């Protein structure tokens, strides 16, 4: 039986996404609307994490932290909109780290609750948060170039680089015992004769391949290269989620 903790996955996604929201907006080069977009999205995901946890399997610290992430994102959103209405274009980027810090506490609780080797569980949860957050924000930033065409490509390069740097950590975390290798050897039954283990491997290899191709696309001079890179990042989101969720779902069963 495949089992996946939806509340933890949604909280990971929200925390990782907000961490890379700060990463991109910290130099105040991106328009305020990009921050509004990301805070709104991750506010909803954190609320869904809290609701899923309360409805399915309560981990008290995780659910309280998810609610805190909602409030942290909402506070940042309100402050940014209020400053804009007063004619102040700058936003204090440090506010975006508040929901990240609160959410990190919830992720620790979720990792401990998952059981197994605590160090491996923590590594998987935080690597997954960074992995999913980086690839999602990269795709969203690619779209933002339609709104703000003069934005330096360097910002998108940095997010794609971040996906590339987090990728080996994510892959190693999933290979550590008890990990994907156990699916390949048959020690862990995926219910499909090891097929899901090979599907995970295909997702992992394809993800880093898409990172390389996206970097190559961004080196082209034409503006359409950014849109091509964004399309590739759509595919990378699918394979990145396969890399993180397939392994965790099978190993948690």
Predicted region positions:
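Hydrophobic cores of alpha-helical transmembrane segments in multi-pass integral membrane proteins
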Residues: 2-86, 91-111, 125-144, 161-184, ...
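Membrane-interface segments at transmembrane helix junctions and kinks
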Residues: 115, 120, 187-199
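Basic (Lys/Arg-enriched) interaction patch that binds polyanionic ligands
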Residues: 157
């Amino acid at each position: 039986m495949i089992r996946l903790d939806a509340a933890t996955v949604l909280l990971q996604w929200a925390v990782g996404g907000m961490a890379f929201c700060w990463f991109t907006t910290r130099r105040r080069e991106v328009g305020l609307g990009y921050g509004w977009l990301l805070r709104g999205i991750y506010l909803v995901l954190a609320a869904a994490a809290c609701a899923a946890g309360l409805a399915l399997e309560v981990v008290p610290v995780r659910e309280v932290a998810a609610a805190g992430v909602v409030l942290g994102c909402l506070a940042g959103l309100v402050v940014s909109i209020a400053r804009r209405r007063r004619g102040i274009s700058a936003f204090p980027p440090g506010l975006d780290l508040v929901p990240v810090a609160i959410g990190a506490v919830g992720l620790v609780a979720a990792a401990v609750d998952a059981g197994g080797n605590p160090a491996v569980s923590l590594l998987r949860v935080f690597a997954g948060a960074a992995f999913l957050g980086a690839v999602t924000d990269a795709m969203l930033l690619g779209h933002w170039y339609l709104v703000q065409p003069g934005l330096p490509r360097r910002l998108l390069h940095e997010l794609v680089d971040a996906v590339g740097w987090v990728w080996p950590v994510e892959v190693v975390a999933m290979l550590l015992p008890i990990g994907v290798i156990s699916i390949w050897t048959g020690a862990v039954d995926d219910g499909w004769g090891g097929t899901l283990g090979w599907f995970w491997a295909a997702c992992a290899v394809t993800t880093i391949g898409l990172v390389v191709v996206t970097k190559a696309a961004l080196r082209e001079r034409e503006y359409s290269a950014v849109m091509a890179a964004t399309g590739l990042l759509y595919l990378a989101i699918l394979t990145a989620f396969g890399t993180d969720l397939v392994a965790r779902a099978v190993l948690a069963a």
